[in-house]
């Protein structure tokens, strides 16, 4: 019996994350010593929509096309909404079970500690170059999101940072290698699923 072809499906919180993960996968394709696994990124459009969207996308868009493939599911999200919430917006055990019920046994979570903006700040030089400002000595704001919003206000072009809006314009200016190296432990399950060898 021939070995099944692998297919990795990423589910992300929003447009900002979709832009970033698509850039990260392009980086892996360029830098990996071997061919990486075929993949697709879906935007679930909000943390609370993972449970419903993951199963419906798998049923309608993935399984009919890749029913003979070994499918791996990767859910990528920010941890900030789980840290202080008395009732978290999503129960990952339920999501995992629903994925398993579809006959998919490989399920991974990629957690951006606090939020993905904290990852972007790992390349403060690239962000500053995009905004045409000097690299700040100190960042203002409590969260990564607030810090990036403050940076954008100082910038020469778009003066407003809004999750999902204009992200495609600054993501190419980011040093993906630098960010990947800084958060490689968090990205390890994704790299394994994609068969990345750097």
PLM feature spans:
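C-terminal accessory helical subdomains adjacent to catalytic cores in phosphodiester-
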Residues: 1-6, 18-45, 55-198
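Extended, compositionally biased accessory segments flanking or bridging domains
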Residues: 11-14, 18
């Amino acid at each position: 019996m021939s070995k099944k072809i692998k297919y990795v499906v990423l589910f992300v919180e929003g447009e900002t994350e979709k832009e970033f993960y698509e850039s990260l996968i392009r980086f892996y394709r360029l830098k990996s010593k071997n061919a990486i696994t075929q993949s697709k990124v879906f935007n679930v459009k909000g943390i609370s929509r993972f449970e419903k969207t993951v199963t419906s996308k798998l049923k309608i868009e993935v399984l009919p096309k890749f029913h003979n493939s070994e499918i791996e599911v990767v859910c990528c999200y920010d941890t900030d909404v789980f840290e202080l919430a008395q009732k978290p917006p999503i129960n990952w055990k339920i999501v995992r079970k629903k994925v398993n019920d579809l006959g998919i046994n490989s399920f991974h979570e990629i957690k951006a500690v606090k939020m993905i903006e904290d990852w972007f700040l790992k390349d403060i030089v690239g962000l500053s170059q995009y905004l045409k400002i000097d690299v700040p000595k100190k960042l203002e704001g409590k969260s990564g999101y607030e810090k990036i919003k403050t940076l954008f206000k100082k910038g020469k072009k778009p003066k407003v940072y809004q999750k999902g809006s204009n992200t495609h314009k600054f993501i190419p200016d980011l040093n993906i290698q630098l960010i990947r190296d800084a958060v490689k432990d968090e990205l390890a399950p994704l790299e394994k699923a994609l068969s990345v060898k750097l």
